[in-house]
């Protein structure tokens, strides 16, 4: 009896260690992918930062420039931006390594669900960042710059502060664009019914404006640019979730909608 228990314990320990070693290898491969992309891009770090700061530069008055208040800021800020770009480019490799680690432990129907969700999550996050860069940044910066002229003030932003603002905004909009995926997962896993999600729609709208007031600059325009897409994406998630309603509850969903 004791020998059987010790054999079972040693088997569990070996299984745990093998999974731990595999996880380490996956993390190392992901890190190497990011580093490889970063090394390829680092030569163009100043150009990448200039492209990154273009929405603000276009909103500055003629001859306006960004400033550096930290001795090392002009070096490290472009490096940080380049690392961010490298991470986004290498993210499919990172997600593949994560998928390769967890896939053996999933059932076939779970694999069929997760793969499209991973692809859609990555795509929606990138779309959210693009939405912030091409629409939100130019709109907000021009709106804020219009208030400087009557005051006789000149807008000069520190590059480190701009990086912090841009990173926060990118993260906020990237996560916001994940709303349809969250809705689909909640419905497909049976955590919340589709009828219940439709019922709480008014609270979601209020919550969208509360969240936008917390994570965006304190102006109405920025809040609208986050809250309105969040609400529309929630509606999109409800539409897509109809295709993923668990078969066992399809009858209940049909009676609830009628």
Ranges and model annotations:
Residues 1-258:
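Membrane topogenic/interface segments and analogous intrinsically disordered interaction regions
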